[in-house]
Amino acid sequence: MAPVKKLVAKGGKKKKQVLKFTLDCTHPVEDRIMDEANSEQFLQERIKVNGKARNLGGGAVTIERSKSKITVTSEVPFSKRYLKYLTKKYLKKNNLHDWLRVVANSKESYELRYFQINQDEEEEEDED
């Protein structure tokens, strides 16, 4: 049998990867149908780190609010999709799911937009 070579990684430690995602709540906050402080509190209670909610990994995940934008910064693996899932859960809990949707407007951010219902209704009336 041939000898088995073991690969040894050269170098030191891995660089910590910092993930930063933003949630833009400008339109619903300006219209006063949503409270950004309440949504920030919801995210703090629901985000799980290492399988535990309300944990936030001892500072590994931070949630900051500036005006109508919520920024989630993470040093541990955190997916953008998980932020969308929690945002949709918040909308459902507060009965806003029928009026708002979560849309990705860049690679690292989501935006809450209204459904375009008025245009659809006008088109249906024109067809009748």
UniProtKB/Swiss-Prot annotation:
GO terms for molecular function: heparin binding; RNA binding; structural constituent of ribosome. This is Large ribosomal subunit protein eL22. One of its GO terms (biological process) is cytoplasmic translation. Component of the large ribosomal subunit. The ribosome is a large ribonucleoprotein complex responsible for the synthesis of proteins in the cell. InterPro entries: Ribosomal_eL22, Ribosomal_eL22_sf. One of its GO terms (cellular component) is ribosome. Keywords: Cytoplasm, Heparin-binding, Phosphoprotein, Ribonucleoprotein, Ribosomal protein, RNA-binding. Its main location: cytoplasm. The modification Phosphothreonine is found at residue 62. The modification N6-succinyllysine is found at residue 69. Belongs to the eukaryotic ribosomal protein eL22 family. The lineage of its organism: Eukaryota, Metazoa, Chordata, Craniata, Vertebrata. The modification Phosphoserine is found at residue 66. Transmembrane segments: none annotated. Component of the large ribosomal subunit. It comes from Oryctolagus cuniculus (Rabbit). It is found in: Cytoplasm.
